[in-house]
Every structure is written in structure tokens, then in C-alpha cells.
UniProtKB/Swiss-Prot annotation:
Taxon lineage: Eukaryota, Metazoa, Chordata, Craniata, Vertebrata
This protein's name: Large ribosomal subunit protein eL33
Family, as annotated: Belongs to the eukaryotic ribosomal protein eL33 family.
Disulphide bonds in the chain: none
Chain segments annotated as transmembrane: none
Function: Component of the large ribosomal subunit. The ribosome is a large ribonucleoprotein complex responsible for the synthesis of proteins in the cell. Required for the proliferation and viability of hematopoietic cells.
Species assigned in the record: Mus musculus (Mouse)
Residue numbers bearing the N6-succinyllysine modification: K63
N6-acetyllysine: residues carrying this PTM: K8, K63
Length: 110
């Protein structure tokens, strides 16, 4: 079986009010999701921000490489247009705004 076990999303920014932004919650726009009821499937799914850094790090069961991951979880819907909120283990860096996030198709709730 080949194919990816994740769908594409864009990190749109942080949860915010008019004057304050809360960096502990990220807003994600999932590709192909345009209504609030369509986000129901993605709630509880794991998400990952994959990026490359300057130095190698040891990967379990593999060679050291420059790839790193920040893991998170989709927590709830945001608005009526298919955006979702996600919490990551460490807050996403601001340079990640506009970049790709992987929303994994697990754990399954079906």
C-alpha cells in the first residue's frame, strides 16, 4: 500500500482576539474542508510540523538527519469556514505561518 496517511493543511496564524494573540493555539486551514460540519472528522487527529534545522539530530532506528517535527493535536473547529484549532507540544514558531502542516488520519474515531 502506497499513499500518504496525512492530509495537507496550512498554518494560518495563532488564535487571537482583537488586540491579543494566544500562541499556545494554532489555526489550521485543512485542504478540501470548507464548512464547520466537515471538520468533525479531523477532531482529535494528530498533526505535525515537519522542518529542517542546521544540525543533525539522532533519530530512533535511523541515521542522524536534519529533519525535525513538532507534534500536536486538532482540538476543535474554529469559525464556520472549515478552520480548526490545534495545540502543539511546543508552540509553533512564527516563521511557520503560511507553511505546510501534516494532519494525520489517525487516531481513528470511526
Amino acid at each position: 500500500m502506497s499513499g500518504r496517511l496525512w492530509c495537507k493543511a496550512i498554518f494560518a496564524g495563532y488564535k487571537r482576539g482583537l488586540r491579543n494573540q494566544r500562541e499556545h493555539t494554532a489555526l489550521l486551514k485543512i485542504e478540501g474542508v470548507y464548512a464547520r460540519d466537515e471538520t468533525e472528522f479531523y477532531l482529535g487527529k494528530r498533526c505535525a510540523y515537519v522542518y529542517k534545522a542546521k544540525n543533525n539530530t539522532v533519530t530512533p532506528g535511523g541515521k542522524p538527519n536534519k529533519t525535525r517535527v513538532i507534534w500536536g493535536k486538532v482540538t476543535r473547529a474554529h469559525g464556520n469556514s472549515g478552520m480548526v484549532r490545534a495545540k502543539f507540544r511546543s508552540n509553533l514558531p512564527a516563521k511557520a505561518i503560511g507553511h505546510r502542516i501534516r494532519v494525520m488520519l489517525y487516531p481513528s474515531r470511526i
